[in-house]
Amino acid sequence: MALWGGRFQGETSALFKLFNDSLPVDYRLFEQDVVGSIAWADAIASVGIITATECSDLKKALNDLLVEVNGDPAIILASGAEDIHSFVESALIAKVGDLGKKLHTGRSRNDQVATDLKLWCQSEGAALLARLHSLHAELLALAEREFDAVMPGYTHLQRAQPVTFGHWCLAYVEMYERDISRLADALTRANTCPLGSGALAGTAYKMDRHALAAALNFAAPTLNSLDSVSDRDHVVELCSTASISMMHLSRMAEDLIFFNSGEANFISLSDEVTSGSSLMPQKKNPDALELIRGKTGRVYGSLVGILTTMKALPLAYNKDMQEDKEGLFDVVDSWAICLDMAALVLSGLKVNRPNALLAAQQGYANSTELADYLVSKGMPFREAHHVVGEVVVAAIAKQIPLEDFSLAELKTFAAIIEDDVYPNLTIEACLAKRDVLGGTALPQIQQAIAAKKAR
């Protein structure tokens, strides 16, 4: 049953119905639509539109419908309704007759869908927060297990300075903590109830919208009816928050894909999250990580989609806004499975310590320590930087590490170099000198892990 038929004399085109109907997408708002309708029944009862008995009958029928559909969700799509609101209203009328036709009094699908969508975002957002916390905990546990595993740190994908795997883990811990904060903030801003805003000008019935908001567990009602039905900031912000988090997931995936490559071989991934080749029997591919990286693009696409949809819409509601849900649902689904998969990857990850250490000892990653040593002897840093560059060129020509030069050879580059240079060139010294807040020295890593676990 269409909710708007009286104005029209001709039949709706079958093609237009297929084009216009949103039930194949917005069926996911069923529970929120029922919950909102139950609260609305109480609201219209409070202003005398229906009696207490009628309100009770409506609420019972709505709760019965909730149970029925949860038992057989296929009922919704089989109905052929235009949208989820039409389905709920038609099913309600089938249960209670003309009483069901009273429920929509004072309400528009505009404030109805805005409320449904915010309820859905609050529910799914809470589940996403839990997933982010789980990933954060898994990464912190990995940092604790491998806090002292030495590996090369990179800039420009070139070996730069030695770090620990624990330090690498904590870098992403910081990123996911910001994701948690962003999502929590977004949910706080979305925690207002549009119900009672009507089509655009507000409902004609003087109900208590504060009580209505509280009944639906919102922090407060919205304050402007035009904004209430036009606003999709919460959709944009959730997609934006997801996009930033997916960027972090994708960067982590890229790091791990490289660390897992035969060329690096710093880590091993569990069989649980890898697959093989149909042709090459030796292959063990990091498909979970590659899919995380790949799904990031579709999340970005949905963000751009909703921004483009909303960018030129006049107030208030426009049918364009029906396009807000498909991208949002896909964003939430993609983000959720990627968070779960990333946590699973980390839970079975093993660091190949000898390989990672060997790589850290190569590539002249201790060059900065030699420059710092020269500075400690009184040489200006810029001059020390130049001298060490010359030492590296000579070392490459001889195919030896810096520490294999004899003292006499080193003195040809800088006469101030003495025997005490060699302890400064060890991996242990490179790490130990970074004993500053945020640094890669082992005490700093341990303190950072302990502080985060204590929260």
From Swiss-Prot:
A GO cellular component annotation in the UniProt record: cytosol
One Pfam family this sequence matches: Lyase_1
Gene Ontology process terms (BP): arginine biosynthetic process via ornithine; L-arginine biosynthetic process
Compartments where found: Cytoplasm
InterPro entries named among the record's database cross-references: Arg_succ_lyase_C, Argininosuccinate_lyase, Fumarase/histidase_N, Fumarate_lyase_CS, Fumarate_lyase_fam, Fumarate_lyase_N, L-Aspartase-like
GO molecular function terms attached to this record: argininosuccinate lyase activity
Annotated pathway: Amino-acid biosynthesis; L-arginine biosynthesis; L-arginine from L-ornithine and carbamoyl phosphate: step 3/3
Coarse class of the protein's main subcellular location: cytoplasm
Entry superkingdom: Bacteria
Reactions catalysed: 2-(N(omega)-L-arginino)succinate = fumarate + L-arginine
Keywords carried by this UniProt record: Amino-acid biosynthesis, Arginine biosynthesis, Cytoplasm, Lyase
SUPFAM superfamilies tied to this protein: L-aspartase-like (SSF48557)
Gene3D superfamilies: Fumarase/aspartase (C-terminal domain) (1.10.40.30), Fumarase/aspartase (Central domain) (1.20.200.10), Fumarase/aspartase (N-terminal domain) (1.10.275.10)
Class in the EC hierarchy, top level: lyase
PROSITE patterns, alphabetized: FUMARATE_LYASES
This enzyme's EC code(s): 4.3.2.1
Family: Belongs to the lyase 1 family. Argininosuccinate lyase subfamily.
Protein name in UniProt: Argininosuccinate lyase
Species this chain originates from: Shewanella baltica (strain OS185)
